């Protein structure tokens, strides 16, 4: 409902894609709403690709805004992104200033870096006060990727480098698409005046569990194999150390999840 109100206020022409029909019944007949029902949980990449493929069928589609289901935006957030994309034709993917929804004085991130020899992702300006001032160009030189909760992508990018990689079920999809875009000489940039509030928890439970740990580690391994294969041996050694540490702490579910990543065994969860 909130995203519909935003679209009506901010855009003359829009296409809203959703997996749920329940709250859209009265809007569908306006001819501005298209509802797509997924047959199964395909994860972040697979689910978003359904909508992206549909949008790309239209010759009028210039940009695609991928937003998590646990985000809310300011009324001018989209227009700022469109203006910057129109101004600089070399930009392929834009990000917004992500702010914690439940603590709107604190920044979640302005983009991210990947530390390949430590196998870690790191959000830039994480936990800084929202009143902190940042230069868009300076921040953009520091980032390796746009945070996946809010990706504003030129349609041309998907046509050139391909869709989100569905090998990843959760995590690292945005790193993958951003690295592929950069290899094709598209620029990444964060527009810090464009604000997106992220509840960070509606998509994935905040509680650390075997399911989320498995997918984070598995996706990290897939990403390493694809872009940093020289570090794969060290990553596997790190997994062995993590397994031993989980066992030592009595965290046997997490140890089992780590072991499955190491051995390449699929994690089966009744909720997916």
Predicted regions and their residues:
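Acidic donor-binding segment of Leloir-type glycosyltransferases
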Residues: 1-40, 50, 54-58
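Acidic metal-phosphate-binding loop of nucleotide-sugar-dependent transferases
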Residues: 42, 70-72, 168
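A short, conserved alpha-helix in the catalytic core of glycosyltransferases
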Residues: 144-195
């Amino acid at each position: 409902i909130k995203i519909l109100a935003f679209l009506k206020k901010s855009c003359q022409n829009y296409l809203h894609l959703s997996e749920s029909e329940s709250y859209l019944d009265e809007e569908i007949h306006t001819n501005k709403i298209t509802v797509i029902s997924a047959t199964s949980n395909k994860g972040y990449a697979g689910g978003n690709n359904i909508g992206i493929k549909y949008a790309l069928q239209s010759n009028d589609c210039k940009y695609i805004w991928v937003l998590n289901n646990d985000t809310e935006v300011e009324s001018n957030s989209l227009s700022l992104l469109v203006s910057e994309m129109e101004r600089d034709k070399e930009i392929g993917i834009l990000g917004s200033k992500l702010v914690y929804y439940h603590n709107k004085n604190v920044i979640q991130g302005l983009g991210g870096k990947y530390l390949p020899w430590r196998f870690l992702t790191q959000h830039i300006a994480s936990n800084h006060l929202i009143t902190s001032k940042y230069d868009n160009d300076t921040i953009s030189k520091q980032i390796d990727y746009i945070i996946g909760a809010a990706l504003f992508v030129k349609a041309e990018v998907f046509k050139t480098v391909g869709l989100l990689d569905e090998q990843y079920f959760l995590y690292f999809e945005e790193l993958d698409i951003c690295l592929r875009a950069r290899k094709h000489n598209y620029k990444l940039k964060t527009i810090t005046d464009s604000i997106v509030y992220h509840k960070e928890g509606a998509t994935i439970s905040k509680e650390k569990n075997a399911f989320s740990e498995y997918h984070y580690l598995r996706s990290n391994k897939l990403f390493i194999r694809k872009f940093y294969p020289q570090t794969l041996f060290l990553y596997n050694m790190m997994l062995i150390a993590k397994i031993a540490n989980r066992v030592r702490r009595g965290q046997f579910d997490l140890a089992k999840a780590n072991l499955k990543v190491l051995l390449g065994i699929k994690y089966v969860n009744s909720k997916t």
